[in-house]
Structures are given as C-alpha cells and as structure tokens.
C-alpha cells in the first residue's frame, strides 16, 4: 500500500512539474503602433530558428492578419521568452529581439501578438483577448490609431500626386489638342475638371 502511494505521489509530482511544458497551438497576430512600414515580422523560440511562425507585413498604424501557427505553453511561467524577427522599411536589415512575455490575462493562453512600437522597439504578449478589451496585457491599450502628424503627411502626399496627375492631363490635352476630335476634346476636358475637384477637395483638408 505504501509503495502504491509513493508511486502515485511520484507520478503526481512529475505531472505537476510538466504542466508548464504543456503546449498549445496559437495563431500569430501583429500590431504596428509606428509610422513605419513593417516589411516582415515573425516569431521564434529562443535558440531554435526552425520553430518560427508568421512573416506578415503591416502598414503604418495597422494590424496584420491572423497566421497559423506557433506553439506557446498552456501555463505562463516567469522565464517565458520569444524572439521577434522583424524588418522595418526602408531599412533592409532583419532584426532579432528576445522579449519577455507578460503573465497571461486570467491565466489563459491565447494567440501570440507581436507588437511594433513607435520608437521601433518590439514586444509580444499571449492573450485570449484583443487590444480593445480591458484584459489586454499589452503596454498600449486599444488598436493602433494614426497620429495627426501622420494623417497630415499622408494628405500632403496624396495632394502632391493628384496635382501631378492634373498637370499631366492638362499638358497632354494641350499637346494633342489639334489631333483630337471634338468629342475626344470634350471628354478630356471633363476628366480634367473632375481632377480639379479632387485637388480642390484635398487642398481644403490640407493646412
């Protein structure tokens, strides 16, 4: 009886010791809180470059898609780390950063979220909940939102492109005017007028 009890106790201790090692499949999500394009972002286990998953690209202040799969422990432990592999445009360099995973919210495993911050640093969390939930363990709460400065720069860039298009259309009509039919000239003028409205609308939004 004592021998059986010792065997049962030993098995229980072994099982308890292995609990942190039990793994679960996790989808890979990515968030970009920066104004730079993320050309590539993926995740690996430390010391094992063949354990990677991901490879998404993300626009500035954007979110990547859900990519399968990566393995994470069912239970969080204090030395849990992953390696984030990433490339930020226009720099062609691939960076590898080992980051610590904070405690799982509610003690539950979930997707692994790779995060790029405004200063170019990276992080990762494992969470069953998204960034808009109060349980979200990330440093920044909520999904990425473009800054006013970034939105203004995008408008200026778009205005410049639309002005270049208008200039091209006007010069093309001037160049080909005497070779076009009346119907084609009318059509070209309508296109130019429409393009002018686009430019005027953008000029009203750019300060």
Feature annotation, model-predicted:
Residues 19-26:
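Beta-strand-rich domain onsets/edges
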Residues 21, 33, 71-72:
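General secretory precursor processing signal
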Residues 26, 77, 87-207:
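Intrinsically disordered, low-complexity segments enriched in small/polar residues
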Residues 38-40:
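Short N-terminal binding/cap micro-motifs at the start of the first secondary-structure element
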Residues 28-36:
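Structural motif
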Residues 2-13:
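Bacterial N-terminal signal peptides that target proteins for export
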Residues 13-19:
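Gram-negative bacterial Sec-dependent N-terminal signal peptides
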Residues 43-92:
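Tryptophan-paired
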């Amino acid at each position: 009886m004592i021998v059986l009890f010792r065997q049962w106790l030993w098995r229980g201790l072994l099982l308890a010791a292995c609990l942190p090692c039990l793994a679960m499949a996790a989808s890979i999500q990515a968030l970009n809180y920066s104004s730079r394009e993320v050309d590539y972002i993926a995740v690996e286990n430390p010391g094992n470059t063949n354990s990677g998953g991901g490879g998404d690209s993300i626009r500035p202040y954007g979110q990547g898609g859900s990519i399968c799969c990566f393995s994470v422990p069912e239970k969080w432990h204090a030395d849990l780390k992953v390696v984030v592999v990433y490339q930020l445009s226009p720099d062609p360099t691939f960076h590898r950063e080992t980051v610590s995973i904070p405690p799982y919210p509610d003690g539950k495993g979930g997707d692994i979220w790779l995060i790029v911050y405004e200063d170019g640093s990276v992080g990762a969390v494992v969470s069953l909940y998204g960034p808009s939930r109060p349980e979200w363990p990330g440093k920044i709460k909520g999904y990425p939102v473009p800054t006013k400065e970034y939105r203004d720069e995008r408008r200026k860039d778009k205005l410049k492109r639309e002005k270049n298009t208008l200039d091209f259309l006007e010069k093309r009509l001037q160049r080909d005017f005497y070779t076009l039919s009346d119907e084609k000239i009318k059509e070209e003028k309508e296109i130019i007028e429409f393009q002018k409205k686009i430019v005027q609308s953008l000029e009203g939004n750019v300060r």
